[in-house]
Amino acid sequence: MRNQLICLALMLCALHSASGLYFHISETERKCFIEEVPDETTVIVNYKVELYDPRSNGFMPSSPGIGMHVEVRDSDDKVILSRVYSSQGRISFTSHTPGEHVICMYSNSTAWFNGAQLRVHLDIQVGEHAIDYANVAQKEKLTELQLRIRQLLDQVQQITKEQNYQRYREERFRHTSESTNSRVLWWSLAQTVVLVCMGFWQMRHLKSFFEAKKLV
């Protein structure tokens, strides 16, 4: 029982998936991130772009002329979102296929700012953690207890999605393993057939050689 509770707690912690970071890019550079996302799961991307100021040797809020082009591809390499946003924004999308989703960002470079260095603050939230429960409570007029129950139900639903996704990955891995084993088997059989044929041909050739030399 204790082990089950520990596993459940670890899964709940994993569901609160959020990654906050910042990185530096030039205006012509493209940066991509990969997120493992179950199907029918909400993903929220918050970002803010800052422009390097050589006079102050620091970063300042970017000008209105600099925005970010955001492109999202699903596990089938299908573009599900491609759009130019402002220098600061919040992007939301829902996955419809499980697997790796690639989120790419690059600036809409202009001749005036071309080559400038940018700092991009990025926060990616996946699953139950992407839901703004304060807004949900206000909109649906939920009490604290009702809100807590809602959170628990969402967590259980997300756990189910995660379990389905893990089963999906196991099935794909098993299919890949079976396919690889089958190819190895057929390749081994092909090698065996080739070796047998070569041995038979060499024996016939040697026999013909000996007969021609009247050694047999």
Curated annotation (Swiss-Prot):
It is a single-pass type I membrane protein. It comes from the Eukaryota. InterPro entries: Emp24-like, GOLD_dom. Residues 204-216 are cytoplasmic. A motif (Prevents secretion from ER) lies at residues 213-216. Residues 21-183 are lumenal. It is found in: Endoplasmic reticulum membrane. The chain crosses the membrane at residues 184-203. One of its GO terms (cellular component) is endoplasmic reticulum membrane. Keywords: Coiled coil, Developmental protein, Endoplasmic reticulum, Membrane, Signal, Transmembrane, Transmembrane helix. Residues 1-20 form the signal peptide. GO terms for biological process: dorsal/ventral pattern formation. The keyword Coiled coil applies. Residues 134-164 form a coiled coil. Pfam families: EMP24_GP25L (PF01105). The keyword Transmembrane helix applies. Residues 30-126 form the GOLD domain. Eca and bai are essential, though not redundant, for dorsoventral patterning of the embryo. Specifically required during early embryogenesis for the activity of maternal tkv, while the zygotic tkv is not affected. Involved in Golgi organization. Belongs to the EMP24/GP25L family. This is Transmembrane emp24 domain-containing protein eca. It comes from Drosophila grimshawi. The gene is eca.
